[in-house]
């Protein structure tokens, strides 16, 4: 019979006094069994970190009780170890010394030999035996977070609290640390509470998932039991019916309680009939020899990348980052580009934007060669570049005033307000950028890009800095606005689900250097799309599996064998054949 190690009974927490009190958590109740792995899923600002701080004894609740082994939590204790999102290491100490510092403080009554063995065991457990003598400044972000995990584990707590420990890491490093946490939880049989905003991470690691509703007055929603056998593998889970059902149920619940992409009632019902300056392109005309080819490209390839190559000089000689990138896009097509870090995705995008010179080949947009930046292209970067002292409206107006020089002030105002309302900022258009969350800033960036009426919209991991639940919301916003404009678009992403949701085709890049297109997947899913609808579509997980297998083949800088790539192509052909057959049956 399992023993209850932690009890939360009607816990309340807020900040401030009287009428200025900001209620954060309300009526939080939960029982955690010894050895259980709990994942708490929640939106940014819902109070997840506040909750973890109370469990660690760093904050006290305003009401209710938190009981650890039947005793009220009054303050911090080595029995409850915590790892925060931002690792706090002693920069002058080595990996070994950082872990030893915690061991010596908690296990001071143990013999020195036993303490040293504890340090060695946990440094090795997180895969840092080879780096034990390095300082934090010599470690990657993922390695530093491993030190934090090792330090917490070496204290041998009864309860390990993990407050979004992997959210700041790149996808590949995050996946590796997820595997290590899963392995540790099984070896140590430790009771673990993980705060995350990643549904797949929660399902991969947890025995039970507890969603936290959006604040203020956030509370726990219904829990979801994860009845999937361990060890769990991402590729295998993708085709597991239990995983598919659970993932859909959790996603649907979270979207129902917190994600809304519904546009606000707009003051501007229709855009004014004004012509952007981008229709008078400043790109240089094609040489005569290319004109016939360019005319064909306009019909079948509105955008054409022709043998595009990028070479950077290095002390060791020229380094070819992108080697012969070839792609044709139809007008109004949405392309996602996906691949591992360093594969040249952003380099391709920056060349299309005219921000990075091309060493060989060329890019044609609407019959003209791209030779530099221009108003016919708009870019949304990962970090929105806004003037912090200007309001949302003023930030968007900067570009609109330049792109529509012949429009009246009222017409330009209508364009700005139309797109700000489309991205859900109708009530915040007069708020300075400095007072906005990252999600709100990115909404301004999206509104600004669409307001320029570009021929080509370029999105460079536009949601990469946001938590996954905020990403869902902005993906829906992006889809809603794009469906109105049908602008030709390229989106660089490392998120498989995002790539499928947005794109008509997904371009998969091989590893760099000398990166090139490894595969192109056509996404034959109905539009308009929503995350909810896609999760129920019979072909969705087949697309997902194809992308995951491609990324897995190139994981860690690997060069996959031809047999491995052939197997991926064979599955793709089988999927296409099945889809064709299903369409034929439906037509009959």
Model features per residue range: what roles?
Residues 112-131, 183, 409-428, 480:
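Conserved ABC ATPase "signature" region
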Residues 135-139, 143, 432-436, 440:
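Conserved ABC ATPase signature
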Residues 2-5, 14-27, 294-302, 311-324, ...:
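A short, flexible loop at the N-terminus of ABC-type nucleotide-binding domains that lies
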Residues 56, 353:
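Helix-to-loop junction immediately C-terminal to a conserved catalytic motif
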Residues 134, 155, 431, 452:
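Conserved signature/switch motifs of ABC ATPase nucleotide-binding domains
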């Amino acid at each position: 019979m399992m023993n209850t190690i932690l009890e939360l009974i009607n816990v309340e927490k807020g900040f401030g006094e009287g009428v200025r009190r900001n209620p954060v958590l309300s009526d939080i109740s939960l029982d955690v069994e010894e050895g259980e792995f709990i994942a708490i899923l929640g939106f940014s600002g819902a109070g997840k970190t506040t909750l973890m701080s109370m469990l660690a004894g760093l904050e006290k609740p305003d009401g209710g009780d938190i009981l650890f082994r039947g005793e009220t939590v009054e303050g911090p204790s080595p029995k409850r170890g915590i790892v925060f999102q931002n690792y706090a290491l002693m920069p002058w100490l080595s990996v070994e010394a950082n872990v030893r510092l915690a061991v010596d403080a908690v296990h001071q009554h143990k013999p020195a030999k036993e303490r040293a063995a504890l340090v060695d065991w946990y440094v090795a457990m997180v895969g840092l035996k080879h780096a034990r003598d390095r300082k934090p400044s010599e470690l990657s972000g993922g390695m530093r977070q491993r030190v934090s995990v090792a330090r917490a584990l070496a204290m041998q707590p009864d309860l390990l609290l993990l407050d979004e420990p992997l959210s700041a890491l790149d996808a590949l490093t995050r996946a590796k640390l997820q595997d290590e946490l899963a392995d540790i939880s099984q070896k140590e049989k430790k009771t673990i509470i993980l705060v995350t905003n990643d549904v797949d991470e929660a399902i991969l690691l947890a025995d039970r998932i507890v969603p936290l509703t959006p604040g203020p007055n956030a509370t726990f929603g219904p829990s979801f039991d994860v009845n999937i056998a361990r060890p769990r593998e991402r590729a295998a889970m993708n085709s597991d019916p239990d995983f598919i059902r659970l993932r859909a149920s959790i996603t649907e619940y979270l979207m129902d309680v917190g994600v809304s992409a519904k546009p606000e009632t707009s003051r501007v019902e229709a855009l004014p009939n004004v012509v952007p300056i981008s229709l008078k392109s400043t790109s240089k005309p094609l040489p005569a020899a290319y004109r016939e080819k360019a005319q064909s490209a306009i019909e079948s390839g509105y955008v054409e990348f022709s043998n595009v190559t990028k070479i950077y000089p290095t002390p060791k000689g020229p380094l070819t980052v992108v080697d012969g990138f070839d792609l044709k896009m139809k007008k109004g097509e949405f392309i996602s580009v996906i691949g591992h870090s360093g594969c040249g995705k952003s380099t391709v995008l920056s060349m299309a934007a005219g921000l990075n010179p091309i060493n060989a080949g060329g890019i044609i947009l609407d019959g003209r060669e791209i030779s530099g930046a221009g108003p016919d292209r708009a870019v949304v970067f990962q970090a929105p570049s806004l003037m912090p002292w200007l309001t949302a409206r003023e930030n968007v107006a900067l570009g609109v005033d330049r792109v529509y020089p012949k429009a009246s002030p009222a017409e330009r105002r209508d364009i700005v307000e139309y797109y700000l309302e489309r991205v859900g900022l109708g009530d915040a258009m007069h708020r300075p950028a400095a007072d906005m969350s990252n999600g709100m800033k990115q909404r301004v960036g999206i509104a600004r890009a669409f307001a320029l009426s570009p021929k080509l919209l370029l999105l460079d991991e536009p949601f990469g800095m946001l938590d996954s639940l905020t990403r869902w919301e902005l993906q829906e916003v992006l889809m809603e606005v794009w469906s109105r404009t049908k602008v030709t678009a390229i989106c660089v992403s490392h998120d498989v689900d995002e790539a499928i949701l947005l794109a008509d085709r997904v371009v998969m890049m091989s590893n760099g250097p000398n990166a090139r297109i490894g595969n192109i997947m056509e996404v034959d899913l109905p539009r308009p799309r929503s995350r909810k609808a896609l999760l129920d579509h019979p072909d969705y997980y087949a697309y997902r599996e194809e992308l995951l297998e491609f990324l897995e083949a190139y994981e860690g800088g690997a060069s996959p064998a031809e047999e491995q790539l052939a197997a991926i192509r064979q599955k793709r052909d089988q999927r296409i054949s099945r889809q064709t057959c299903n369409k034929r049956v439906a037509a009959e």
